[in-house]
Amino acid sequence: MPTTMQALVGAESGGYRLAENVDIPVPQRGSILVQVHAVALNPRDAKIVDFSNAPGSLGGCDFAGTVKKVGEGVTRFKEGDRVLAVTFGSNALDKTKGAFAEFALAEEDISCRIPEDFSFTQACSIGLSMATAGLAIFQAPGLELSLHGGKGEAVLVSGGATATGTMATQLLRMAGYTPIVTCSPANNALCQSYGAAACFDYHSPACGADIRVQTNDSLRYVLDCVTDTTTMKMCYEAIGSSGGSYIALETIATTVKYTRRDVRADWFLADAIMGNGVQMAGTYGRAPSPELRRFGKQLFALAENWLHDGSIRHHPLEIQDGGLANMPQALNDMKLGKVHAKKLVVPILGH
């Protein structure tokens, strides 16, 4: 096995650069070293190097591959196992953590064994959307819904055709809730195929009011996967007159937040699921949270079962070849909005 690798790391001037001869990290207690076969790209990967760059740190979150080494105390996995995992790259606290490399570290309890009928390109798209949707729906400061016993109550997912949106729709269905979504009419069939009970056109100025009518003024819970001023206003209009909870994936506009005192509004970072705290600029920093790590362990154990019994599906994929060398271009395509209703995936092994 080699001792060095290629990796995409934070550049001193911002953005990423392709680095040669990067030391392959050593798995510590509770972690595994994975030879990366494929990675998925997420908006976080493009944004983070602009607002909280960590030069020299490995980039990326979503990956899948084969286990090459296991750290002390690891019992779930062995060398040769096919796994998917999520990590949080561009991490100033630990620059060896990141997915955009030929080898990547994963935490044993924030990883899943891949079903035999799953390819690596499919599997690598699961981790971050699972972590994000799971935290948003089931944990504070998210909606804090029950993993079981939803009793059919409607929950709105704004951005139902995003990767987090389709995952959230599936998780809500399994927990007994009735997911309704906003999306473009062109994506109605896509969202319905993941379990959306109703789709509303976010282009319509009456979108929020229409949802409020259709839910009989009773909507209490909203997950906003888009998170801008327009979608936040729409979500506020949709929530019933008794108030409710709104959770976002980005910082939220206070100009909208305080227009309704009966709505609890907050936002979160999926990075917090690792429990180690988050060192980022401004309001993005997070204190350590063992409770969130315990939830992450529970969630990924469940996710492994759901994958193997077919309860959840991955988001539609767009595969770009070229390996690590093509990653800056792929990230730029995503940043410019050239990818719609698909998860961008790049095969690594063999490129």
Swiss-Prot record:
Sorted keywords for this record are: NADP, Nucleotide-binding, Oxidoreductase
The EC designation for this entry is 1.-.-.-
Leading EC class: oxidoreductase
**In terms of domain of life, where is this protein from?**
Eukaryota
Residue intervals passing through the bilayer: none
So where does NADP(+) get bound?
161-164, 184-187, 202, 249-250, 339-340
Q: In which pathway does it act?
A: Secondary metabolite biosynthesis
What GO molecular function annotation could you give as one example from this UniProt entry? Answer: nucleotide binding
**Domain Enoyl reductase (ER) intervals:** 10-346
Entry keyword annotation includes NADP: yes
Which InterPro entries does its entry note?
ADH-like_C, ADH-like_N, GroES-like_sf, NAD(P)-bd_dom_sf, PKS_ER, Trans-enoyl_RdTase-like
> Coiled-coil regions in this chain?
none
Family membership: Belongs to the zinc-containing alcohol dehydrogenase family.
Q: What does this protein do?
A: Trans-enoyl reductase; part of the gene cluster that mediates the biosynthesis of gregatin A, a fungal polyketide featuring an alkylated furanone core. The PKS grgA synthesizes C11 and C4 polyketide chains in the presence and absence of the trans-enoyl reductase grgB, respectively. The polyketide transferase grgF is then responsible for the fusion of the two carbon chains to produce the furanone skeleton of gregatin A. Next, the cytochrome P450 monooxygenase grgG accepts performs the oxidative cyclization to furnish the gregatin scaffold and leads to the formation of desmethylgregatin A.
**Protein name from the UniProt record:** Trans-enoyl reductase grgB
Source species:
Penicillium sp
Its taxonomic path starts at: Eukaryota, Fungi, Dikarya, Ascomycota, Pezizomycotina
Q: Which gene encodes it?
A: grgB
